[in-house]
Amino acid sequence: MTGPPGRSDDLNALLRQIARGERDAFAMFYDHTCTRVYGLVARVLRDAGYSEETTQEIYLEVWRTASDYDATKGSPLAWLLTMAHRRAVDRVRAEQAGSQRESRYGAANVDLASDVVADSAIAGDERRRVVECLDGLTDTQRQCIELAYYGGLTYAEVSQRLATNLSTIKSRMRDALRGLRNCLDAS
């Protein structure tokens, strides 16, 4: 191969070779792309162990589906990073679903002595405070918070839904969370 590692033409050729089952091509493809894939996955998952495991799953999928790659639909790196992002987000969702299942099971199977009336009053007060603080945000900040936290969307999905740049969404979320924290701390 000629040119710098990771060039689209080089990766294209490697994917064709991987589709034919050539292990050396797979090793070269991995060497050229693993840093970017792992970096993307680690940013989404924020856990080294899960990131390594997910990266391994992604490359296993590359080995199995290299023949499905269509060069007319995008570059090999875009195909790979899209696959990586989807797999990482799926992992986040699976972990969240597992945690929620465990929480529901634990809540349903633990009988704690508690004052139901007091707990209900406290929960109602907390809900009221959160609603008041949400009302103090700008409409765009509130919309971002609602989509991400109540709608379960990732920042990228919020960006797509609102047709707004991802960095703008991140800024709005940061400002909104800071505003909520300040409001809740003050009340």
From Swiss-Prot:
Q: Respond yes or no to whether keyword Transcription regulation is given for this record.
A: yes
Checking Gene3D superfamilies in the record gives: 1.10.1740.10, Winged helix-like DNA-binding domain superfamily/Winged helix DNA-binding domain
Keyword Transcription regulation listed? The answer is: yes
Q: Where is this motif: Interaction with polymerase core subunit RpoC?
A: 53-56
UniProt feature coiled coil, ranges: none
Instruction: List the CDD domains.
Output: Sigma70_r4
Q: SUPFAM superfamilies from the xrefs? A: Sigma2 domain of RNA polymerase sigma factors, Sigma3 and sigma4 domains of RNA polymerase sigma factors
Query: Which family is it part of?
Result: Belongs to the sigma-70 factor family. ECF subfamily.
Assembly information from the UniProt record? Interacts transiently with the RNA polymerase catalytic core formed by RpoA, RpoB, RpoC and RpoZ (2 alpha, 1 beta, 1 beta' and 1 omega subunit) to form the RNA polymerase holoenzyme that can initiate transcription. Interacts (via sigma-70 factor domain 4) with anti-sigma-K factor RskA.
The domain section of the record reads: The sigma-70 factor domain-2 mediates sequence-specific interaction with the -10 element in promoter DNA, and plays an important role in melting the double-stranded DNA and the formation of the transcription bubble. The sigma-70 factor domain-2 mediates interaction with the RNA polymerase subunits RpoB and RpoC.
Protein name as catalogued:
ECF RNA polymerase sigma factor SigK
Organism of this sequence: Mycobacterium ulcerans (strain Agy99)
Question: Taxonomic lineage per UniProt?
Answer: Bacteria, Bacillati, Actinomycetota, Actinomycetes, Mycobacteriales
